[in-house]
């Protein structure tokens, strides 16, 4: 017997590496040392930082991956993977430096894997983050035919003096919400159930003219470049930041708010995007469940000094980023630290 007889095709793996090399190299930064194929990837951190603090993050894309596989949409799920990781490390003020991915499947389909990794490389390129390595694991009998799993890992850096940890947050600080591109990569176990039970046709169109499937599969917004620009120009105005992921608005912003303080969020400050309105209507989802499951149109939040909030908003306007003042930091009353109304 051979390894191929057992279900592992080394030649297919080598073909994949050759296919993705030019895509991966487009994401490289000057600090990357060497190319693909080494036992370890190298990144030169010297020269750019005085007191660097490394910030790491790892994530997947949840069961959005299941929907992507059902629809045969493999080219953007990699952008989701990058977004889930780099947006997280950005919260602490870190610039994502490099990224690694893990792709696992029962039988390697080179075309599918190349499409996925192409999306990862594109997400890294858009975030200024180098895709310096990864693992492609072909594991017979571990996954049903046509299915695969994904995970990502990123490392960023921030000057120690510029690290955002929420310590500067004060009562009266303003919450500025930046628009999401859709559900991003959270809440998809509920989304898939609603989609299946609604029986909506593949061509169903939402109130804004977008196809439902396109809205559900829209890749996660990448906030790295615009937010890093804000930190450079208005860093003193930003006291904390939050990436709105699993747990929604209810559970994510509060993670960067010190004890003794709470949040008041004005749900009338922005309009619920059509894809979320459809999900709530078709799934009979209560308001409270919407807030703690989905981002509801707000993908990233800046906690800002009130006197400088207007300047931040002008800077967001200059970058053509949709945004709203969605609330403020208040004194907490009892166990209820987040009020949405």
From Swiss-Prot:
EC number: 6.3.3.1
Catalytic activity: 2-formamido-N(1)-(5-O-phospho-beta-D-ribosyl)acetamidine + ATP = 5-amino-1-(5-phospho-beta-D-ribosyl)imidazole + ADP + phosphate + H(+)
Enzyme class per UniProt: ligase
Coiled coil: none
Keywords annotated in UniProt: ATP-binding, Cytoplasm, Ligase, Nucleotide-binding, Purine biosynthesis
UniProt cross-references to CDD domains, sorted A to Z: PurM (cd02196)
Cell compartment(s), UniProt: Cytoplasm
GO molecular function: ATP binding; phosphoribosylamine-glycine ligase activity; phosphoribosylformylglycinamidine cyclo-ligase activity
Main subcellular location: cytoplasm
Listed GO CC annotations: cytosol
The protein's annotated pathway: Purine metabolism; IMP biosynthesis via de novo pathway; 5-amino-1-(5-phospho-D-ribosyl)imidazole from N(2)-formyl-N(1)-(5-phospho-D-ribosyl)glycinamide: step 2/2
Keyword DNA-binding in annotation: no
UniProt-listed InterPro entries: PurM-like_C_dom (IPR010918), PurM-like_C_sf (IPR036676), PurM-like_N (IPR016188), PurM-like_N_sf (IPR036921), PurM_cligase (IPR004733)
Family as reported in the entry's similarity comment: Belongs to the AIR synthase family.
Protein name in UniProt: Phosphoribosylformylglycinamidine cyclo-ligase
Protein species of origin: Xanthomonas axonopodis pv. citri (strain 306)
Lineage, uppermost ranks: Bacteria, Pseudomonadati, Pseudomonadota, Gammaproteobacteria, Lysobacterales
